């Protein structure tokens, strides 16, 4: 199932050898199930904003349900990773007290996958999106659902490496 990782590695330039080696390690040897690790990678790729990259990853994943859930998570986190830090940065109690009035149904519906997996995809996208509030909420949520610290670490590792890949791709 992870043949796409080998294809991706071929596009990474030699100056990014660490990234090339890390992409293999974080996905193929993750503590997460393979399908989940791949979809975590896709959610992170989506969050990088490199549409050529994430659409390619989306196209090569075999599990369409997980792939679609990952981009759904990436999409809603693209909104929330901006909205929640904005509220905090504005530092206005009146603003904080107002409802967001933004649709967030994807979170309640889990993008067609399990709640746990959708949370993992949201965490990956939020790590790349650098939203402290979203990272903390999804990290704590997953920990409460039984994810180990090793699994949570691996979500972070996948997100970090996919972010790096998005910056070094030349093809």
Briefly describe each language-model feature range.
Residues 1-171:
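Hydrophobic alpha-helical segments
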């Amino acid at each position: 199932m992870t043949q796409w990782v080998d294809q991706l590695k071929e596009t990474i330039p030699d100056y990014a050898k660490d990234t090339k080696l890390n992409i293999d390690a974080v996905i193929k040897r993750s503590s997460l199930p393979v399908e989940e690790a791949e979809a975590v990678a896709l959610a992170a790729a989506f969050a990088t904003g490199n549409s050529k990259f994430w659409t390619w990853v989306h196209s090569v994943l075999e599990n369409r349900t997980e792939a679609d859930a990952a981009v759904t998570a990436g999409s809603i986190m693209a909104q929330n990773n901006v909205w929640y830090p904005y509220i905090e940065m504005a530092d206005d109690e009146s603003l904080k007290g107002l409802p967001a009035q933004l649709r967030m149904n994807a979170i309640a519906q889990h993008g067609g996958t399990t709640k746990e997996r959708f949370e993992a995809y949201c965490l990956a996208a939020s790590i790349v999106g650098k939203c402290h509030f979203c990272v903390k909420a999804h990290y704590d949520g997953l920990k409460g659902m039984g994810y180990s610290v090793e699994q949570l670490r691996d979500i972070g590792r996948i997100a970090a490496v996919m972010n790096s890949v998005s910056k070094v791709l030349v093809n």
